[in-house]
């Protein structure tokens, strides 16, 4: 008995180290996910890339997610989340290296595609791995911290134009090789994560007679209406936020707002920096006061307002940055826990897989469409007005996201709600549909 108690105490302390390793690994993935944005102008000037080519470099990483969304759960169940995280990190290093070699253009696209295989798997694998280390009462806090620390990677790559300025002075390639080094650090963290998981992970207490859930194609689309509303919000919000912020924002700030590369990178980074600290706070507020659907509606409303401020006013860039920062902190903090309240536990894997699949398609399509629109309008440093059509595209897309949030709010305040508007204790007691 004492030895068992000591082992439990040791595992309780070790799980925080495991969380730190997972955060390092996923942060390296987030860093390389966004690595094209800061060098977009350099790729324009030094290699003559078009807006469509830049859009492809970011859009292509979403393509593997379509397939991985359907098989990730099966791979994790078959081989274990820690092993999948390790192999995903290794694939990510390969993709980052090919991207850094970067010539010809097709090799760079191939590198981004290979990195997309890693990016699509590692986030879910690490999160599933953490669920095996943390109890049911602790996984929510662990997931919030994990998500916040993951965004350190996004913040770091945006601010790299300032703290790694000498790299950017040397051209487009050194920042990509630096990103490869970051990916290698993530692989080291994933390796240690895998080793600790193999030798020290707490024993899982499975419920007798509870069969493993499989993807049921016959009932794939049989979800409650609230699920389809929140799926629409997942997809449309991501299709607006990530293409704009990771592909086009820095270049737009340079050409349309007159910022230097360093200033544009810092302005863009504050959205991710705020999310690092604010995401757990909004999650705690939702648990404390409820009104999750209302919070999602408010957070999504800030998205179209941001593009109105950018395109139709002369307000300081920091106004739109603060608005988008609040939105990006609030919506992810609430939408994932809200999804788990709407969907029955036995079907949660299928539900999240379907969300991930359609979300990947939406982000890839939005990236390519925005780039094509900007190219057609002749957007660039000599024609800042050419970016207006891209802003209108994102504005209209964000309005459709807002409509999904409003529909979800209306349903959840009626008799068919799932407890999203209630405080956590009541929500947990609500019957899953």
Q: Predicted regions span which residues?
A:
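Helix-loop-helix hairpin linking two adjacent transmembrane segments in secondary transporters
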Residues: 145-198
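Conserved MFS/SLC helix-loop-helix module at the cytosolic interface between two early adjacent transmembrane helices
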Residues: 67-106
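Helix-breaking motifs and short loop linkers at transmembrane-helix boundaries and internal kinks
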Residues: 48, 80, 101-107, 135, ...
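Juxtamembrane intracellular "pre-TM" segments in multi-pass secondary transporters
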Residues: 4-12, 197-231, 423-432
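Cytoplasmic helix-loop-helix junction between adjacent transmembrane helices
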Residues: 111-150
């Amino acid at each position: 008995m004492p030895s068992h108690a000591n082992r439990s105490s040791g595992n309780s302390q070790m799980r925080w180290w495991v969380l730190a390793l997972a955060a390092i690994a996923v942060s390296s993935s987030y860093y390389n996910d966004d690595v094209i944005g800061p060098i977009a102008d350099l790729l324009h000037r030094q290699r003559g890339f078009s807006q469509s080519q830049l859009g492809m470099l970011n859009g292509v990483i979403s393509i593997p997610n379509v397939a991985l969304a359907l098989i990730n759960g099966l791979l994790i169940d078959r081989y274990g989340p820690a092993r999948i995280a390790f192999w995903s990190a290794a694939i990510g290093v390969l993709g980052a290296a090919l991207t850094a070699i970067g010539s010809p253009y097709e090799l760079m696209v191939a590198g981004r595609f290979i990195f997309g295989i890693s990016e699509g798997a590692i986030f879910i694998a690490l999160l599933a791995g953490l669920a095996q280390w943390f109890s049911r009462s602790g996984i929510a806090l662990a997931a919030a911290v994990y998500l916040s620390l993951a965004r350190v990677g996004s913040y770091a790559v945006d601010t790299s134009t300032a703290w790694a300025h000498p790299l950017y002075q040397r051209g487009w390639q050194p920042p990509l090789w630096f990103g490869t080094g970051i990916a290698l650090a993530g692989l080291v963290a994933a390796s240690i994560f895998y080793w600790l998981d193999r030798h020290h992970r707490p024993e899982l207490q499975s419920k007798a007679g509870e069969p493993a859930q499989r993807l049921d194609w016959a009932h794939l689309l049989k979800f409650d209406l609230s699920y389809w509303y929140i799926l629409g919000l997942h997809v449309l919000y991501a299709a607006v936020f990530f293409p704009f912020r990771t592909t086009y924002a820095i270049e737009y700030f340079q050409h349309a707002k007159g910022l230097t590369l360093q200033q544009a990178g810092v302005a863009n980074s504050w959205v991710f920096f705020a999310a690092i600290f604010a995401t757990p706070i909004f999650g705690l507020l939702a648990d404390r006061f409820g009104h999750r659907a209302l919070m999602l509606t408010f957070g999504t409303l800030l998205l179209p307002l941001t593009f109105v401020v950018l395109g139709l006013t002369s307000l300081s860039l920091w106004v739109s940055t603060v608005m988008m920062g609040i939105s990006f902190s609030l919506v992810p903090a609430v939408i994932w826990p809200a999804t788990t309240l709407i969907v029955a536990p036995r079907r949660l894997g299928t539900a999240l897989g379907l969300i991930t699949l359609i979300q990947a398609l939406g982000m890839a399509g939005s990236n390519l469409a925005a780039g094509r629109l900007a190219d057609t309008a002749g957007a660039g440093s000599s024609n800042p007005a050419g970016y207006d059509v891209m802003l209108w595209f994102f504005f209209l897309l964000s309005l459709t996201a807002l409509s999904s949030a409003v529909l979800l709010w209306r349903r959840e305040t009626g008799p068919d709600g799932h407890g999203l508007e209630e405080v956590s204790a009541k929500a947990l007691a609500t019957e899953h549909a």
